[in-house]
């Protein structure tokens, strides 16, 4: 009986509290705030004390400090939305007004980290589905979200050289913020036909085997095929050192944290990246979307790296090198995003927009009248199946392929580029008759030597004809002459790096084909630059070992 009286007393007191006027409780509870309509949240947020204004160097509307008023009717910039559903990396946001367009960046307000959401499709009824660029742990329904009214915007320019940034342009190298007033959105249109340069030019790298047999095109796309420990990283750093006088960008798409850290340290040791007061002399900017990042981050980090490179091309008017490692992980990340958005998969489980996703990025890598972006992309072939949709779609965009061979690496010949498997569209008579004939002559000699190796292994050199013996001797000299010491490897080998001009390279190999240097020992051709160094080394060897 006592318990019944206690319960009825509690109910009467609760009823009286619920009938009190709202002004008697000026501090609403969390439940009241959470259950309010988006319109009331927007009004309350708009009348709150203004937040601190963003720095002048930051792009407008990217700091999550909006006042709740729409500043652009077309994009809905400044509108405040509310998280209504969270499914892993997918976040649904509801707006009472100011619905953002696709690819607009939204920022979660008052969150423990800077969480950027990119708008995907609209779900109707003022709700948009977004992809998170970072982890959504700790995000709750009802959390406020600001419509920035613009795509993801990142810092660009010389301030990014020597720094590591993530997909949204935040520095992750613990060396302070990037101080610049230059920003660009990562979603941009490809250069128009009028702006593009139609003249094809060879991009001289100073690396003999590349320039002679598989030359790169300015503004072209190069596929870099190579396994572990065959010199891929050293080749990348040498290209940065030789070609990119001040501008190169490395985009690690789905990069292992350990690999990214190792590359950063190797670049510092080789002088590609400099710290402290000499940071302005750095030659490379690094953009990482690590393997443990959400798929949205890995799918967009390639665009972030490309945007940094585009600024150097368009504003600085320079030839930029863009390295993407790995291209397959970019496709994989977009496939994950497509599955999260509920799209029906296409062949072999890839997203139905595979060609569009890849083409949108590749078409921005081109030569304009101001400068060029030359892309070197590491290509992974799943199960060695060249008909797989991912590599097959990529091959359609490539202008050259550089294949690193483990067999050549085991011979101690570096760079370990396979001269027979590497190809280029630039190797045509139109690019230079002498260059073309010399390159084809070198490949013919090497192919004949490869065909004779089985006979040599079974019968020996003595059973070969005189012409075949001459072919083998010249091929072995050519094989060793294709080796070259790198500038970035000086600290490991002690040998000074060599840069060989294209004309000197062609003349030297033509001389070997013509038999001008048949009397020189093949050891004198190993790890040198031009033919003059070979002659000098042969004379030195003759003096040291007189016969």
From Swiss-Prot:
HAMAP family, per the entry? ATP_synth_beta_bact
PROSITE patterns, alphabetically? ATPASE_ALPHA_BETA (PS00152)
Entry GO MF terms: ATP binding; ATP hydrolysis activity; proton-transporting ATP synthase activity, rotational mechanism
Instruction: Name where it's found.
Output: Mitochondrion; Mitochondrion inner membrane
Classification via SUPFAM superfamilies:
C-terminal domain of alpha and beta subunits of F1 ATP synthase, N-terminal domain of alpha and beta subunits of F1 ATP synthase, P-loop containing nucleoside triphosphate hydrolases
| Residues annotated for ATP binding in this entry | 226-233
Q: Which reaction does it catalyse?
A: ATP + H2O + 4 H(+)(in) = ADP + phosphate + 5 H(+)(out)
Hey, which family's this protein in? Belongs to the ATPase alpha/beta chains family.
The protein's name is ATP synthase subunit beta, mitochondrial
Q: Where is the composition biased (Low complexity)?
A: 52-62
An annotated GO cellular component: proton-transporting ATP synthase complex
Enumerate the UniProt keywords alphabetically: ATP synthesis, ATP-binding, CF(1), Hydrogen ion transport, Ion transport, Membrane, Mitochondrion, Mitochondrion inner membrane, Nucleotide-binding, Transit peptide, Translocase, Transport
